[in-house]
From Swiss-Prot:
Binding-site residues, [4Fe-4S] cluster 1: C24, C60, C89
Gene3D superfamilies assigned to the protein according to its UniProt record, in alphabetical order: Methylthiotransferase, N-terminal domain, Nucleic acid-binding proteins, tm_1862 like domain
Cofactor note: Binds 2 [4Fe-4S] clusters. One cluster is coordinated with 3 cysteines and an exchangeable S-adenosyl-L-methionine.
Organism encoding this protein: Paraburkholderia phymatum (strain DSM 17167 / CIP 108236 / LMG 21445 / STM815)
The keyword Transmembrane appears for this protein: no
Name under which the protein is recorded: Ribosomal protein uS12 methylthiotransferase RimO
């Protein structure tokens, strides 16, 4: 059972809810919001199936493997507990017959909702497990209940997406872009920093599009006007982070021209060191014909020019991206163009998926589907080239002294991350010496580490 137990003062009459959270960081934020509301209403969060009066499962439905994992988790919860409420992206998915997929596979579930549905989930919980008469709302921290370690947190700034990429079904499950009010985002960020968070990871389906749906409406924070726009929000978050000596990291940044305005914030002025020189930009491919079939921006030469311009302004910039190999119709020549792009762009961190048909995606209707073995071979070749590029860039860090955020302390020393490393998806820094590590620093501290070794993914160094 994959969930975080939240301590409280249980009584025999306290209703208890188990929680299973699957999927991406955006789904994790949904889980945090549901758990925060449960706690605010006086429910206890159980760490076991046996100790729970019912179980909520937050699902993922993006790719086939995630669908199966979610269905298996629902089945396990039904077997172990019997009372299950399902929410998340898979909850919005239909089966081939047109009925709700979850209800068709698991007809015994108590209720099913789609993603970002705190109100609907709470209604279902109330129906099957009435809330306590005297909830202690003031026991819930202002920052809400978080499922991440105390020193970092995800800050979701919008829901949904306006793009219609042919390989993606997210808009059909999460809808079009809906930006959160800028004052609401800033208040959450402030509460998180006050609670001890040292790193905020800004997430959404499309961070660059923040505010498009409200025409960049001006909001107010602490009496100051702030436009509902990515660059203005990043500036405000950077200013706030500087007050707490914290980091702000940007994820899911679609390569709009406005991104160019953010780079100087990473390189100079009062934001430097707080708005991290890190961009997570999902390029997906480099050949114009493949990008056209994906319905993605289709000019790799301009992308290369922008990457070079970004690095000229901010030499320490780390660029992470994701790609798809073996997309329908991709020729060997087009795949080689992708490899050339990786070599020329020298991206620091990349992930690659062998294309997999996703039920409901329009890419399934495209001609030229490739055999499984070809798709997987291209993915493996892509990662081989990407590893070579990454190892070359990582080697340049040897001998430098870098600021590291400590994530863990164990008998071998410390484990942390630099500004170039997002949690769980990027590399780590192994910190020596092991002796008296816990007396030198603690989890959530920033330490200066001299880098002594590197491979294509991780670094080694000494305090």
């Amino acid at each position: 059972m994959s969930q975080t137990s939240i301590s409280s003062a249980p009584t025999a009459l306290t209703p208890k809810v188990g929680f299973v959270s699957l999927g991406c960081p955006k789904a994790l934020v949904d889980s945090e919001q549901i758990i925060t509301q449960l706690r605010a209403e006086g429910y206890e969060i159980s760490g076991t199936y046996d100790g729970a009066d019912l179980v909520v499962v937050n699902t993922c439905g993006f790719i086939d493997e995630a669908v199966q994992e979610s269905l298996d988790a629902i089945g396990e919860a039904l077997n172990e507990n019997g009372k299950v409420i399902v929410t998340g992206c898979l909850g919005a998915k239909q089966s081939a017959s047109g009925s709700n997929l979850i209800e068709e596979v698991h007809p015994k579930v108590l209720a099913v909702t789609g993603p970002h549905a705190v109100g609907e989930v709470m209604q279902a919980v109330h129906s099957h497990l009435p809330k306590p008469h005297d909830p202690f709302v003031d026991l819930v921290p202002a920052a809400g209940v978080k499922l991440t370690p105390r020193h970092y947190a995800y800050l979701k700034i919008s829901e949904g997406c306006n793009h219609r990429c042919t390989f993606c079904i997210i808009p059909s499950m999460r809808g079009d872009l809906v930006s959160r009010p800028v004052a609401e985002v800033m208040l959450e960020a402030e509460n998180l920093f006050k609670s001890g968070v040292k790193e905020l990871l800004v997430i959404s389906q499309d961070t660059s599009a923040y505010g498009v749906d409200v025409k960049y409406r001006t909001g107010f924070w602490n009496g100051k006007p702030i436009k509902t726009r990515m660059t203005d929000l990043v500036g405000a978050l950077g200013e706030l982070a500087a007050q707490y000596g914290a980091w702000v990291r940007l994820h899911y940044v679609y390569p709009y021209p406005s991104v160019d305005e953010v780079i100087p914030m990473m390189a100079e002025g009062s934001f430097k060191g707080h708005v991290l020189p890190y961009l997570d930009v999902p390029f997906q491919h480099a050949h114009p014909e493949v990008l056209k079939r994906m319905k993605r921006p289709a000019n790799a030469e301009k992308v290369l020019e922008r990457v070079r311009a970004w690095r000229e302004i901010c030499p320490d910039l780390t660029i992470r991206s994701t790609f798809i190999a073996g997309f329908p119709g991709e020729t060997q020549e087009q795949f080689e163009t992708l490899l050339d792009f990786i070599r020329e762009a020298e991206l620091d961190r990349v992930g690659c998926f062998a294309y997999s048909p996703v039920e409901g995606a329009t890419a399934n209707e495209l001609d030229g589907a490739l055999p499984d073995e070809v798709r997987e071979a291209r993915r493996a070749r892509f990662m081989e080239v990407a590893e070579q590029v990454s190892a070359k860039r990582m080697a340049r860090k040897v001998g430098k002294t870098l600021k590291v955020l400590v994530d863990e302390i164990n008998p071998d020393g410390g484990i942390g991350r630099t500004a170039a490393d997002a949690p769980e998806i990027d590399g780590v820094v192994y910190i020596a010496p092991a002796t008296k590590a816990s007396k030198r620093y603690k989890v959530g501290d920033f330490v200066s580490v001299k880098i002594t070794g590197a491979d294509g993914h991780d670094l080694w160094g000494e305090v």
